[in-house]
Amino acid sequence: MKKHKFRETLKSFFEPHFDHEKGEMLKGTKTEIDEKVNKILGMVESGDVNEDESNRQVVADLVKEFYSEYQSLYRQYDDLTGEIRKKVNGKGESSSSSSSDSDSDHSSKRKVKRNGNGKVEKDVELVTGALKQQIEAANLEIADLKGKLTTTVEEKEAVDSELELALMKLKESEEISSKLKLETEKLEDEKSIALSDNRELHQKLEVAGKTETDLNQKLEDIKKERDELQTERDNGIKRFQEAEKVAEDWKTTSDQLKDETSNLKQQLEASEQRVSELTSGMNSAEEENKSLSLKVSEISDVIQQGQTTIQELISELGEMKEKYKEKESEHSSLVELHKTHERESSSQVKELEAHIESSEKLVADFTQSLNNAEEEKKLLSQKIAELSNEIQEAQNTMQELMSESGQLKESHSVKERELFSLRDIHEIHQRDSSTRASELEAQLESSKQQVSDLSASLKAAEEENKAISSKNVETMNKLEQTQNTIQELMAELGKLKDSHREKESELSSLVEVHETHQRDSSIHVKELEEQVESSKKLVAELNQTLNNAEEEKKVLSQKIAELSNEIKEAQNTIQELVSESGQLKESHSVKDRDLFSLRDIHETHQRESSTRVSELEAQLESSEQRISDLTVDLKDAEEENKAISSKNLEIMDKLEQAQNTIKELMDELGELKDRHKEKESELSSLVKSADQQVADMKQSLDNAEEEKKMLSQRILDISNEIQEAQKTIQEHMSESEQLKESHGVKERELTGLRDIHETHQRESSTRLSELETQLKLLEQRVVDLSASLNAAEEEKKSLSSMILEITDELKQAQSKVQELVTELAESKDTLTQKENELSSFVEVHEAHKRDSSSQVKELEARVESAEEQVKELNQNLNSSEEEKKILSQQISEMSIKIKRAESTIQELSSESERLKGSHAEKDNELFSLRDIHETHQRELSTQLRGLEAQLESSEHRVLELSESLKAAEEESRTMSTKISETSDELERTQIMVQELTADSSKLKEQLAEKESKLFLLTEKDSKSQVQIKELEATVATLELELESVRARIIDLETEIASKTTVVEQLEAQNREMVARISELEKTMEERGTELSALTQKLEDNDKQSSSSIETLTAEIDGLRAELDSMSVQKEEVEKQMVCKSEEASVKIKRLDDEVNGLRQQVASLDSQRAELEIQLEKKSEEISEYLSQITNLKEEIINKVKVHESILEEINGLSEKIKGRELELETLGKQRSELDEELRTKKEENVQMHDKINVASSEIMALTELINNLKNELDSLQVQKSETEAELEREKQEKSELSNQITDVQKALVEQEAAYNTLEEEHKQINELFKETEATLNKVTVDYKEAQRLLEERGKEVTSRDSTIGVHEETMESLRNELEMKGDEIETLMEKISNIEVKLRLSNQKLRVTEQVLTEKEEAFRKEEAKHLEEQALLEKNLTMTHETYRGMIKEIADKVNITVDGFQSMSEKLTEKQGRYEKTVMEASKILWTATNWVIERNHEKEKMNKEIEKKDEEIKKLGGKVREDEKEKEMMKETLMGLGEEKREAIRQLCVWIDHHRSRCEYLEEVLSKTVVARGQRRVSQRT
């Protein structure tokens, strides 16, 4: 029975491990995988996968590797399943036979005992089969993992494609950045040019200030030089005298010639030295003269610039004044003043033209004088040339006289040439002089014979010397005259400086006047703008007249006359409107006052213009005086030139006479020539200065012409403004007509209201309620829309800030993408290398292509699934993009709605104002109607009360009469007729009562109707309140939506921040985990040392162990539990194979070795082994705890990786949102461009209209075109200034943007460096992990070797123990009877032990398989590590290169930015100063204008209120008149009715009187009858008595 139980347990343990159906399924899957692998290889080799050969080779190599691993696993699986099936079938047959004979006899037990070991081995084999099945399942899981790896590879490829797209985008962004850089460079060049221009201007100004002082100093130097020249002239005269004395000495004694020759040599040397000194001095003087001329030219340029600036300022002042005149003339209807102003301007223009013509004539005279001066210069040069020829002739004569001294002639000719080049031929002259002296000494004897000849020649020479001296005197006089002219010119320069200073003071005063005028003009402009705003109300009425005026403008040629006529017509129409509209009398009176003030302003402005014209005329006169002075100076210079020419002739005559002193005279001639050149240079400089002044005058004339053109254009502008004023007048006329029409309509409505008072009450009440509700709704809508607009603006601001932040994040992402691109490039290089390596392995794997078809199919299916996933992802992306587009469209629609809302707000505001006016009118009407109704009610109530009193009195009378009638009927029937008449009268009175009751019922109905109207009004108010509440609810919902959008934006920002913090936390946690792993590894090493110590203790204790079998059974049960826990741990270890499987395998091997030793030493184990096993259990528990910790760490790492991936996905989503926002921005930019185009078209239309007007007015304003052109040029200059200021502001903005970009780039660089550091740290951590894994592998190998050594030792011990067991078998037979009872227990224990051994073997096999897999993975990891190292090196190189380039770019940008910042700072300081001045003036003017505008607005409001009140009062008066009329009618009706009632009463009274008289007569008759009867009765009684 126990054996059956044991077999059943084995079957229950092993049956699930081998299933026939699962085996067939695995075969089918194997065939499918083989087909798929073959298909993939075929596609790869045919080139269907990709066009790149590298990708094909990689895919083929991966498939082959996968297929080889798969085949190896499948072979192991086939072997294990085959062995298990054989063993299971054998056991099934043996189980049936053994079950019948299990309990038959005791002998079978012995067989079982003998065959126990064989059965245990079979059981062990079964257990190994089960373990093999588990290994196969693990292999299947490995295959699944590999499939996941393929999917990850495909995902990586998809990521690579996305990275390529990102690279393309990065390239585009780089191109854009390069374009921006080029633009920035261009802007910087322009900035540098502008800065250089400004610096040059500053330098010129400084030079202008310095040159004034330099000129003064140079004037003093010139005076000193003049004194020196005078002294030299005296010295020259003295030398002439000495030369004459020497000539007389020559006549007397020829013996003294030798001494004289020596003296002459000395004098020649001294003269040569003097000549050299003079030449150097002359050169220095020439250089100084040149510098002076340059400085004078610079001063003249500066003066010209100052004059131009003065003219510009004057023109600007004139422009401003004319602008203010235009503004005043636009809104003034003073045509006569305009005509006078035009006449004055035309006369002034004519005068200016005359001045210009005279100045042009003067310029022509100047040009002629300059031409004459140039001709005279040419004559002087010719005379100088003739003088040089005469000198040469004199030299020739000297050579003829000095026939014996031919060498002297050569020396003279050489010296003549040396005058032009003194420095170059000085040495040659010295040599010639020495040779000449020797020759003179040799020829003194021959000269004695020729003394007589020479005496005659000397006499002639003396005469010539006298003539030359006279000429020298004349030249000196002329030199003095030139010096005097120079002094005069210097004085003129001083005067010019003084005049310049005066002009500067005038300029400052003009600037102050200009500022004051600007203030006044700004105030006046604001007043005119207010008037224009007030006149805009009449624009609608004047449109028709404007169209007519435009048609007339096209036809008519003379614009000014037409304008004046139209203005007169407009004034007449205005006067007619004023006469027609009595309500607007006050506004027109105010306008008349304004017109009078404008007249005064216009007269003052005319006075200012006349003063300005007089100032310009004075300036022209001063310029003419300057021109006349310059002409005088030119004439003086010409006379000086003539005098110099005569002096030169005289000097040449003296040179012919002074033959002995020719050397000194030649030196002096050289000096004179140099002086002549200096004078010529001075004259040329004077001529240049004159030319410059003439040019300045021409420029001033040109400026005057430009001013004329500007004035003409300004006149055109004035005409245009007059046209606009006419348009406004026409519009006012049209508005007045509309007001009249509206007034007539209102009068008609009032008449209709009088006729239909009751219906109007109903309609007015309903209308008023509706208007009140509408007003409330509109006001609430305005408030809500304003709030929504503010919220939208705040949202726009927040969105703009978000966009900026997202752009920063985009830049960071782009930098990261660039890094990834570099990594991809490096990985591609490594892949190409690997492909070359793998190409060698292709031939080996060709045999496996057939078997890999099924694998190819599986891979195809996976590829298809991956493609489907990719499609799904693409669809998701497309959907997200569509959602982004939809969001962008919604945003654009929201912006359009906001614009529409703004427009609707404006419309509603205008409508609300109109409705308020109408509401006020209707309120007034309502109040008047209510008053009328109340008075009417009061009157009706009084009438009803009177009628009721009358009814009561009539009823009383009817009762009395009925009683009297009854008495009368009883008394007499004759009164029936009268009674019928009275009944008719009563019926009439009853009819009247019924009518009165009907009237009272009608009045009651009217009251009921009014009460119903009031009820309806209350209902409408309630409805309007409900609508207001609904609108408030919608506004609240919109605000909630806005708040939700803001909250989303804030959430996104918080999510981004939290994700960044999470990433940082994950990095910190990774570091902590790495530290913990390192600590755990250290603890594992310590545990390994403890285990080695324990193994040594086990060996010692094995020798001494002799424990009982019972303890072994308990220990085996514990080992079984441990094995179960170890199987669980192994499953966990299989999941965690990557990190710590090697350590577990080492420990499990040690445990296997220990268990084998225990199995072999079952009989000899004792209590010590139990203690050791308890220690092992503790250690295994510790190992399991460590493994669980490792798994937890891995799970945490995986979760963090997932979180990181999710963060990356969110970042991608944000980037896509940013793209959508960019698209929205592009759409907004397009809309803006469209709006700009519309504005341009409108501007073009306006320009076309202005062109038409200009064409119409060009025929009349031909004279003023010059002035207008000048004004246009000044306007263009002002526009250029404004444009430059705008460009400066733009450049400032660009500068700020560039600084922001630089900060962004720096942030991106910092982030890149941080990312690089994190990558380096991760790489270091990976390297440390690899090192640790290598160390653990080394430890595992060492432990494995030690385990093999221990196994060998244990095997020896086992053999020794077997021998001892053989010895003790005999003793065992004797004890067999005692052990029969315990045999079954031992068998069960042995079976358990065998099961444990089987499990251990299976676990060992699993561990070996896992070790193989790990070795393969280690190789793959090593390859990947090498790849990563190479990629890291390339990345480091690329990063260094990028860092260097970025740093260089940053330095360049920083330098350029600093330069631009300096320039901008200087410019900004100047601009701020100027802006401060202008802002002060503008602020003061704005304050004045503000007060004026407020006053005018208040006045206008008061006028409007007064007009409205007057209108309301008129309407009320009219209504009251109508009511009075109605009341009079009603009173007449009542009077008529009362008269009728009075007549009826009179008739009734008359009838009653008649009736009473009748009754009285009847009573009297009856009384008489009674008295008669009584008398008759008394008589009868008396008679009877008698």
Swiss-Prot record:
Keyword presence, Ubl conjugation: no
LRR repeat segments: 173-187, 188-210, 216-239, 261-285, 287-309, 384-410, 437-461, 473-498, 560-586, 613-637, 649-674, 768-792, 824-850, 856-880, 902-929, 944-968, 990-1014, 1077-1101, 1120-1144, 1195-1220, 1247-1272, 1372-1396, 1398-1417, 1426-1448, 1450-1474
Region annotated Disordered, chain positions: 88-119, 249-286, 325-353, 430-456, 965-985
Induction: Induced by osmotic stress (e.g. mannitol) and abscisic acid (ABA).
UniProt note: phenotype after gene disruption: Short hypocotyls. Increased sensitivity to osmotic stress (e.g. mannitol), but reduced sensitivity to abscisic acid (ABA) associated with lower levels of abiotic stress-related gene expression but higher ABA biosynthesis genes levels.
Keywords annotated in UniProt: Abscisic acid signaling pathway, Cell membrane, Coiled coil, Cytoplasm, Cytoskeleton, Leucine-rich repeat, Membrane, Repeat
GO MF, one annotated term: actin binding
Tissue: Mainly expressed in photosynthetic and vascular tissues. Accumulates in both dark-grown and light-grown seedlings roots and shoots, leaves and flowers (at protein level).
Domain NAB span(s) in chain numbering: 10-84
Compositionally biased intervals (Polar residues): 444-455
Residue ranges, compositional bias (Basic and acidic residues): 249-262
InterPro entries: NAB
Localization per record: Cell membrane; Cytoplasm, Cytoskeleton
GO process annotations (BP): abscisic acid-activated signaling pathway; cellular response to abscisic acid stimulus; positive regulation of abscisic acid-activated signaling pathway; regulation of protein import into nucleus; response to abscisic acid; response to osmotic stress
UniProt subunit comment: Interacts with COP1 coiled-coil region.
Cited function: Positive regulator of abscisic acid (ABA)-mediated signaling pathways involved in abiotic stress responses (e.g. osmotic stress) and leading to various plant adaptation (e.g. stomata closure).
Protein name, entry field: COP1-interactive protein 1
Organism: Arabidopsis thaliana (Mouse-ear cress)
